[in-house]
């Protein structure tokens, strides 16, 4: 699987290392940065690069990171590379500036920072960690989180506050695990990083760690939602679980040791820019038209700030600068009061730092570079008449709607005009179909899925006429068409009629064949396929495929999806709370895809599972890991370099993107600042003829808590550009 020519490179680099050690290593051992001719490849030094060797008392340090950071540019900028087998490194394509350079790696502590400019060679001294605890401070959050002791299988179903403290609504251990990974707190921020595994001083005055945790989860504007999550699990038992975890860590318990980057992982180059502001948090980023990633080449990127602020952050990666685009609702007087902090925050005190009225969740670029977003256009209760019962709107006649909390909007960079778009259906994620109408499909509609014909909307400006929605109807009578007469979700299957289900989409992903896939949260969860038909409001049919369960209702392997995507072959790829990536291929199904038995558990053979590369929770003996990625994104067009249809998980506990390459994981780890956490990525090809330099993945720091990163309060969100060069020394 490893495609680099390692034998030749090892021999060549080994000879160079020996020559350099004789003639020049002594002059540079202290970090001296005089320009030289013979760099790590024995050629003239590139005037936009910094290179050298990393050594320690143990010899060359392979698979460690060399980081260059500067604040000389319009926004904070850094670039990170990995050393090869001989400890050699090359940091390419650096803008002219003064940089701090240092070494970070597993088994090390950070080396002293050395100042340098592009065009210099710089040998660096790595610093061996003085003890195991010092080394573990740099491990990904998921390694620490794997020390969590999940309640035993025998404790389920829960017996409530007067019993074992676990909610009686949780029937098995798997559903509990879902809530401690991507179905709970991990959906908003990383767990296991230093900010979480250590209790802040604000909570030091309590008699027990359980009491301290009870106070902790009430902090800040998210205190209410955190408290509700705990109550849903059974707050007393859950608080005891987390208190035990942090107590053991405080007493010196350490996690397993991660391996250093190897193989293709050493070819990764990561460039970072700051954007937004220290009190805002990002959700997603968009760089191009998903359907043609050569569009918007070298162009600006746009982000979404969800509940934190009323603007779109903008990054210009060529000018290394950031900006803001204001967004707003249709009613300028709609300005709801931001939620007050439930209790004092250890970072922000009693200050409410989030104040968005627009709730921008997800951006997407179209074929002309417009930025389409899911955003609030009006107050949720101000429902247009055309949405409701009695309207002549075709979708309302089929299935009228009431309130919805988030809608659509579009920003045109050419005219610099933003326009809110009032929709009847709620929205969350959005993605364009490959059709002549440039149909924008959305998730987040609950009982329905909604869409906007953007061609029609741009031509007419008529939002009502350009939108539509449909409920989710299973073809349970097996006649191959949708019938007007169907049974409701709370009614039993009738083999002579179709059935409506409440399988609201979380993710949404139009496929090349015109179908629209999505993920359904909960336990065991499902992927859902919608076939729109000629008139989706009345013709769309749904297929529903649950994660497989055994006769006891326990998972056969993985469970509980969150984000998902589709590849060019119509295979769905999904991130699971169980710590897996899974694929679902409906062409493998042996049973009928419609009829009275096609209600969820009818195609276990369509599923394949890939355990994410983190340790499993300490006391769990079932398949999975302590990961639980937020989203799966498929690189359909080889924007990164691992090939078409490469599925990539967001790796929220790994501090990395996790690319599945020929059945093996490639970890695109972000070592600095610790705490990388993203909810989405995008891939763009800026120049198809430029090799690795003309393509790459884009992501943003998406946690609600940028102040949890190692750089602490004052840290803003970041944009990350991941690129993969042919070898670690390519400039």
Feature locations, PLM:
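Short Pro-Gly-centered beta-turn/loop motif in secreted/extracellular proteins
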Residues: 61, 90-98, 106
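A short, solvent-exposed loop/turn motif at the edges and junctions
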Residues: 71-76, 98-119
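Beta-strand-rich domain onsets/edges
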Residues: 24-49, 53-59
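Short, conserved, GDST-rich strand-edge loop motifs in beta-rich repeat architectures
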Residues: 195-202, 296, 303-306, 373-404, ...
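The canonical Cys-X-X-Cys-His
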Residues: 181-193, 242
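Structural signature of eukaryotic scaffold interfaces centered on beta-propeller domains
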Residues: 276-297, 352-368, 429-437, 495-513, ...
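Short, acidic Ser/Thr/Gly-rich low-complexity loop/linker segments typical of extracellular
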Residues: 71-93, 114
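Short, ordered, surface-exposed loop/turn motifs in non-cytosolic proteins
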Residues: 48-50, 56-72, 76, 96, ...
